[in-house]
Amino acid sequence: MKVTKAELAHVAVKAEQYPKNQLPELALAGRSNVGKSSFINKMLNRKGLARTSGQPGKTQTLNFYEINERLYFVDVPGYGYAKVSKTERAAWGKMIETYLSEREELKAVLQLVDIRHRPSEDDQLMYNWMKHYGIPVILVATKADKIPKGKWQKQLTAIAKTLDKEASDPLLFFSSATGLGKDEAWRTILNHLKVTE
């Protein structure tokens, strides 16, 4: 998809702060430092729109990125990072759970996992939780440029097996460094939203 307009339109910690224009939303979930901000920047052709950080756990709000005035990417705080207090983690958890389980505009979750490693227990819990709530999932294996091409399929198979992936859930590989998988990711997203480019 050709992105002509992209902006961070809303930052929210509670439902009253969510967008009101009823555009379809795709949430991005994943462990801290899996590359969500880099994924957003590459997909939207905007280098510094989503701020990347060497500090895991940097995103502490729901960040709504409006794209072409047609849909939103919603960056969700990364999970599985220990260097925040239990109280903060509980607050994030509640905020994320409320958004994911109650938001009508949410059409799917892009769950990002690192292609180099088997999904963690947190990844598995997140995937199972979304399945429990009937939320469609598009799995994106990031950092594909970090391993040889010959190992991609083996790693994707391991990811699918570890998560006990449902056959209907797409599993894509992606590299924010090279743009690999970007067109396929957009095709999958638009197909899922049943909208044309």
Curated annotation (Swiss-Prot):
It comes from the Bacteria. Belongs to the TRAFAC class TrmE-Era-EngA-EngB-Septin-like GTPase superfamily. EngB GTPase family. One of its GO terms (molecular function) is GTP binding. The gene is engB. Transmembrane segments: none annotated. It comes from Shouchella clausii (strain KSM-K16) (Alkalihalobacillus clausii). Pfam families: MMR_HSR1 (PF01926). Residues 22-195 form the EngB-type G domain. GO terms for cellular component: cytosol. HAMAP family: GTPase_EngB (MF_00321). Coiled coil: none annotated. GTP binds at residues 30-37, 57-61, 75-78, 142-145, 174-176. This is Probable GTP-binding protein EngB.
